[in-house]
Amino acid sequence: MKKLTSSEFRQMFLDFFKDHGHMIMPSASLIPQDDPTLLWINSGVATMKKYFDGSVVPKNHRITSSQKSIRTNDIENVGKTARHQTFFEMLGNFSVGDYFRDEAIPWAWEFLTSPKWLGLPKEKLYCTVYPKDVDSQRVWEKAGMPADHIVKLEDNFWDIGEGPCGPDTEIFYDRGQENNDVAEDDPENFPGGENARYLEIWNIVFSQYNHLPNGKYVDQPHKNIDTGMGLERVLSILQDAPTNFETDLFLPIIHATEEMTDGKKYGENKEDTTAFKIIADHVRAVSFAIADGALPSNSGRGYVLRRLIRRADLHGQRLGIKGAFLYKLVPVVGKIMQSHYPEVMDQRGFIENVIQNEEKRFQATLDTGLTLLDDLIDKAKKSDDKTISGKDAFKMFDTYGFPYELTFESAQDAGLKVDKKGFDAEMQAQKERARKARGDLQSMGRQDVTLMNIKDKSVFERDTYEEPHAKLLDIVVDDKLVDKADGEHATLVFDKTPFYAERGGQVADHGNIYDQDGELVAKVTDVQHAPNNQNLHFVDLILPMEKGKEYVLKIDKERREGLRHSHSATHLLHAALRQVLGEHTHQAGSLVDPDYLRFDFTAMEPMTPREIKSVEELVNQKIWEAIDVKTTITTPEEGEKMGALALFDGKYGDKVRVVQMGDFSSEFCGGTHCSNTNQIGIFKIISESAVGAGMRRIEAVTSKKAYEYLANRSSLLDDIQADVKATKPDNIIDKIDSLESDLHDSQKQVEALTKQINQAKAGQIFDDVKQAGDLTVIATVADVNGMNDLRELADNWKSGNKSDVLVLAAENDGKANMIISLGQKALDKGLKAGDLIKKVAPIFGGGGGGRPNMAQAGGKRPEGLNDAIKAVIEEISKN
């Protein structure tokens, strides 16, 4: 067995499958693109969906990759087991309708056992197969796996609902009984059982069926292979490490953490060792997630990052580390992974800054959470069972970021218990809600056989406004290939076309199709890419169309011009944002429309007005510099050497198109562009807003639309000038300032008069003193304007010692308000204003709270105020 570093092992896997004709696919971003079913990329196959469902046909049907992945469904187990991680790498080899089990199994055996490759002892390897999958058992035995090392398990069938599915085979490594956590005669002590002896290292899925909505299974027209090998698991074998955490991927991080403590060492005791593991795992996850564009927040991916950072910091405190420390480990992570993943070191400063800022913010959250936890402990001490409820513990976890363990330990120190079952039930309910929210989107989708079978070559004539005479090659109506279309709608493929198909954020061209006599036969309403890369024209038919005939294709030239302006301006905007905000700014999405453009990007804070102005000025400067727009067809590798930005998941073919605008902007792009930036004319940002946690959006217009926008603003300015009676536009601000000053003076006069009126009313109100038991009460619905006036009356009441209890209510704009104040005599009797207001507020459709001596509430049913006042007096009378 070879002793390999993580870098050597990763490269060996990729080289092995490259030697077997596979294309090495770079790791995709951890943030999924165009896949709402995933929060994170969580496996290698997650990036292959478009190939397996047939929506895209890859250049090479054999693919291999080492994919960054994050899984967060069981964060609480990280650090407590040998293998649980949030961030990990999944090695995989994939076949899209090419080879199948007769190749996949022998290759796996060769890579694992051949002295040229890993050289694992054959006697240590076992596999599991689906009982009905006799073919896999046959191929395994032929490859060299002993029959008594092949275990049949019903679980070996991969099926996630509607879509591709099939049997799978899992490979296990026998680590020996000395490494087991169950007895040798335990019924779970077998490959595939719940034990620590047999380590699962590789899974091969034979995706040969389609699971239909009606529950039936049918053969797929194209059978696929999907495999996954956990890099860290196999590395623990190659490096003779007891767990994943003793490999060269984790130990440098753990040693760096040790140096930050007051002498604590990894492995000395269980509690500290768990803390070291959690910190090492979590800093890897957050470093790569931030490098790929995620930022801490209160929802979605951002919430996961926030939770990981806080959990790591809490365990740092347990190790005696004071203050922010996690950010200091980022360069350690970057150095370990740099050979294959340079992004962490490339963005080191930004990642450190994000983590450090989040760590600093956590102290305030920690203080608040600890205060609330103290309240829960006091509450539990007064309860009969001396237990913090599972609901309260989950609230501490879900709302304030307190892991269950911290709540449990604090309760234990106070001699209390925590309802773990209740907590688990709340956690499971949340997971179930999330699962149901995604619903049927979990399916990978059925293969579209009709479109996949269209193999005719179609050429996109990108930069022409000519009207080509194109031959109609294929017609699809109601998901079937036909020779003639004579209904309302059809989908068409031509041998050549000037129509751009929607991709990369740019919407499709529209236009018309004419016959050879110049008669309109169809309107093109949309254009999309077929699996084999033809442009699919979705049309509304005017006249019948026949396969094999020639037609004249005319795009909407005005629409195309608008798209060219918007797309080139989008590239300039992206470059300007990176220059003004920093190169850590990631594009997170875009829309290129003929009327406007939309650009989403990662950012921790809103842009300032100065930043927006700087970006806008920089884009216009580049427009007016009249820079030639140059396009180059090259390889992805050469494109990167040219400095071109590769966006999103980095899935490119053998050739890419690089669009350059001088030395200011260079990107991989397949869209349509101006030939010179001056054709854009003018660029105007019309909005900058939030679209989610850590995500901002700019909307902008160009050319004619920018002129129309500015003309409308100018007209609006003229209207304002007339309304405020300014002599010229330059005087508008001064005129508005003067009007605001006059308004402020008038408001002060109104407030003074209102105060006088309220004082007069107070005299009348405070004269009406009632008796409730042995307490004096002033209680009425006052004729005042809402809560502010009620507070002012309450302040007057305090200074006058007019009664023991004050209950005032008011109606304003259909809303109900109430305030209760208690004097010392009422307080001495044990009355609390907060308790009283909570009890009666529902009577007028509201809720509220406050201190023992004063509380307030608002509601939606003012007609209930008198009944609420009566209820307060009744409660007081009981005392």
UniProtKB/Swiss-Prot annotation:
Keyword RNA-binding in annotation: yes
Names of required cofactors: Zn(2+)
Subcellular location: Cytoplasm
Keyword terms of this UniProt record: Aminoacyl-tRNA synthetase, ATP-binding, Cytoplasm, Ligase, Metal-binding, Nucleotide-binding, Protein biosynthesis, RNA-binding, tRNA-binding, Zinc
GO terms of biological process kind: alanyl-tRNA aminoacylation
EC number of this enzyme: 6.1.1.7
UniProt cofactor note: Binds 1 zinc ion per subunit.
Record's keyword annotation contains Metal-binding: yes
Binding site for Zn(2+): H567, H571, C669, H673
Main location: cytoplasm
GO molecular function: alanine-tRNA ligase activity; aminoacyl-tRNA deacylase activity; ATP binding; catalytic activity, acting on a protein; transferase activity; tRNA binding; zinc ion binding
Gene Ontology CC annotation, any one: cytosol
Catalytic activity: tRNA(Ala) + L-alanine + ATP = L-alanyl-tRNA(Ala) + AMP + diphosphate
Highest taxon listed in the record's lineage: Bacteria
NCBIfam families named among the record's database cross-references: alaS (TIGR00344)
Domain notes: Consists of three domains; the N-terminal catalytic domain, the editing domain and the C-terminal C-Ala domain. The editing domain removes incorrectly charged amino acids, while the C-Ala domain, along with tRNA(Ala), serves as a bridge to cooperatively bring together the editing and aminoacylation centers thus stimulating deacylation of misacylated tRNAs.
Record family assignment: Belongs to the class-II aminoacyl-tRNA synthetase family.
Function field: Catalyzes the attachment of alanine to tRNA(Ala) in a two-step reaction: alanine is first activated by ATP to form Ala-AMP and then transferred to the acceptor end of tRNA(Ala). Also edits incorrectly charged Ser-tRNA(Ala) and Gly-tRNA(Ala) via its editing domain.
PANTHER family assigned: ALANINE--TRNA LIGASE, CYTOPLASMIC, ALANYL-TRNA SYNTHETASE
Name of the protein in its database record: Alanine--tRNA ligase
